[in-house]
Amino acid sequence: MSVPPHLEEWEPKTKLGRMVKEGEIKTIDEVFAQGWKILEPEIVDWLLPDLEEEVLDVNMVQKMHKSGRRVRFRVTVVVGNKDGFVGVGQGKAREVGPAIRAAIDRAKLNIIKVRRGCGSWECGCGRPHSIPFEITGKCGSVRITLKPAPRGTGLVAGETAQKVLEMAGIEDVWTKTTGGKGKGETRTTINFAKATFDALRNLIYVRMREEEAERLGIVSGSAEGA
């Protein structure tokens, strides 16, 4: 595996980081299987070099202080490889650039393995283009329900949820959302992103019989070879 140039001088600060750089752990699947907590974004950079990122929201926050008005930027970002791994994070800083970088790092630390499949009774193709079953996620007043959709449906979702789902590698899904009204566009964007992420995270906790998982074509993480 070729190492991205910016990682050649990386000096890991955690045991997991050292194991990754020394080649003891070679895949992100091993990290999840062994229950490691990711504390360095470079670990994700090393194991998922094809990760992409997209800014979902940039918000300027002003606070009055005895020395005058202070301005900070709060940024929400989604990262993913469009094949079963996705993360959402927020960052704050006095300038937009550093806030974006902080949000990207936080999103990498929050990365999860997404369970995909074909749970629509209208389809039954057995490929991981959708989700295997209906699932709900919440954040604040926002609640989103993801429902399996047949192949070719696309992502029937709001713009924010759509971006998170795309980064996770989900191609077809129906959604139903409640809440978030009257809270302001920025707060709603953040909550919808986090609620969608919460729903995707909840997929992994549902227990299924092996034969049922096989029928639904369930894949956790990368679908390469599926």
UniProtKB/Swiss-Prot annotation:
GO terms for biological process: translation. The keyword Secreted does not apply. HAMAP family: Ribosomal_uS5_A (MF_01307_A). It comes from Methanopyrus kandleri (strain AV19 / DSM 6324 / JCM 9639 / NBRC 100938). This is Small ribosomal subunit protein uS5. The gene is rps5. Gene3D superfamilies: 3.30.160.20, 3.30.230.10. It holds the Pfam family Ribosomal_S5_C. Part of the 30S ribosomal subunit. Contacts protein S4.
